[in-house]
Swiss-Prot record:
Gene3D superfamilies documented for this protein: 3.30.230.10, GHMP kinase, C-terminal domain
Source taxon at top rank: Bacteria
The EC number(s) this enzyme carries: 2.7.1.39
Signal peptide, first to last residue: none
Family affiliation: Belongs to the GHMP kinase family. Homoserine kinase subfamily.
Protein's name in the database: Homoserine kinase
Native source organism of the sequence: Aquifex aeolicus (strain VF5)
BP GO terms, sorted: threonine biosynthetic process
UniProt pathway: Amino-acid biosynthesis; L-threonine biosynthesis; L-threonine from L-aspartate: step 4/5
Annotated GO CC locations: cytoplasm
Catalytic activity reported: L-homoserine + ATP = O-phospho-L-homoserine + ADP + H(+)
Underlying gene: thrB
Cystine crosslinks: none
Organism lineage: Bacteria, Pseudomonadati, Aquificota, Aquificia, Aquificales
Length: 297
C-alpha cells in the first residue's frame, strides 16, 4: 500500500485572516491501494465521515484521476484521523491533499504544485490551509487574477503551540456566515498593520510584539458567538505568560503561542472554555512542521 502523511494546519493567527497558515506536527495518514471495489476504513476520529464514495478523500482522488486522464480505479482506503474534524485544524485539507497525492502516486504521475493547487481549490477555496499542508512551514498566501501566490517563511523553533480543542464543532460554512459583507476602512487598516507586524516579529524573533500583532477586527469579534468564552480565554492565557492567543482557523479551537508554561496556559484556557460553553476541551501542545505532505510507497 501507498501511505500518505498530511499535516494538520492552523491559520489566520488573528490578524492574518485568509492569509497565514502553518503546518503542524499532528498528522492524518491515508494508506491506499487499488481494489475490486471501494473500501473505506476509518481509524481515530470517525463521527460523520463517510465510509463510501462520498468520502472527501475518495472524491478528490477521482477528480485528480480525471484531471490526469486516468480512469479512477476503486480503492481500499485506511484513513487514520488524528486531526479532530471541524475544529479549525485543517482536517478537510488533509483529505484533499491526500486524495491528490494518492491519485498521482498510484498512477506514477507527477504534477507541478500549481496544477495540484488547481485541483485542491475546486474543493477548498481558501489557500491558507491547503498550501502549508502541501509545502509545510509557515506560509503567507495571496490570491490574484492569475492564481495564488505564496511565500514559505521560517517559523521559530523555540515557539511551542498550545491548542485547546473544545468538544463541539464549528463548520467553516457556519463560521463564514457570521462574518459581515463589508467592514469599515479603519478596521481593515487595523488588520493590515498587525499582520505586517506579525511577520516582522516572527522573522526578528521580537516576541513581545506578538500579542499586539494577533489582534483582529475582521473575523474573531463576529465568531465569538460561536465560541463562548473566547475573549475571557485570551485574557487568562496572557496572565499565564502566553505570547499570543487567537482562534485557530474558523474555530472553535483556540491557539496560543509560547516559549514556556505551555501546560499551565492550556489548562487555564480549557477551564474558561468549559465554564462558558458547558463543553469539555482537550489540550494539545504541538510544534511547527517544516515538511508538508509525505508519500511513502
Amino acid at each position: 500500500m501507498i501511505k500518505i502523511e498530511v499535516p494538520a494546519t492552523t491559520t489566520n493567527f488573528g490578524s492574518g485572516f485568509d492569509t497565514f497558515g502553518l503546518a503542524l506536527s499532528l498528522t492524518n495518514t491515508f494508506s491506499v491501494d487499488f481494489s475490486d471495489k471501494y473500501e473505506v476504513q476509518i481509524e481515530g476520529y470517525s463521527s460523520g465521515i463517510p465510509k463510501d464514495q462520498k468520502n472527501l478523500f475518495i472524491k478528490v482522488y477521482k477528480k485528480t484521476c480525471q484531471s490526469i486522464g486516468k480512469k479512477p480505479k476503486p480503492l481500499k482506503l485506511i484513513q487514520e484521523n488524528r486531526v479532530p474534524p471541524a475544529r479549525g485544524l485543517g482536517s478537510s485539507a488533509t483529505a484533499i491533499v491526500g486524495g491528490i497525492e494518492a491519485a498521482l502516486a498510484l498512477h506514477k504521475v507527477e504534477l507541478p504544485l500549481k496544477e495540484k493547487l488547481k485541483i485542491a481549490f475546486e474543493f477548498e477555496k481558501h489557500p491558507d490551509n491547503i498550501i502549508p499542508a502541501f509545502v509545510g512551514g509557515f506560509t503567507v498566501c495571496a490570491t490574484s487574477e492569475s492564481g495564488v501566490i505564496f511565500k514559505k517563511l521560517p517559523f521559530p523553533e523555540d515557539i511551542k503551540i498550545v491548542f485547546v480543542i473544545p468538544d463541539f464543532e464549528v463548520s467553516t460554512s457556519e463560521a463564514r456566515r457570521v462574518l459581515p459583507k463589508k467592514v469599515e476602512l479603519k478596521e481593515a487598516v487595523f488588520n493590515v498593520q498587525r499582520s505586517a507586524l506579525f511577520v516582522s516579529a516572527l522573522l526578528t524573533k521580537d516576541y513581545k510584539l506578538l500579542r499586539e500583532a494577533v489582534r483582529d477586527k475582521l473575523h474573531q469579534p463576529y465568531r465569538e458567538k460561536l465560541v463562548p468564552g473566547l475573549s475571557e480565554a485570551i485574557l487568562v492565557s496572557y496572565k499565564e505568560g502566553a505570547l499570543a492567543t487567537f482562534l485557530s482557523g474558523a474555530g472553535p479551537t483556540i491557539c496560543s503561542l509560547t516559549t514556556e508554561n505551555e501546560e499551565k496556559i492550556g489548562e487555564a484556557i480549557r477551564e474558561v472554555i468549559t465554564k462558558f460553553s458547558g463543553y469539555d476541551a482537550q489540550v494539545m501542545v504541538l510544534k511547527a512542521r517544516n515538511e508538508g505532505v509525505k508519500v511513502y510507497s
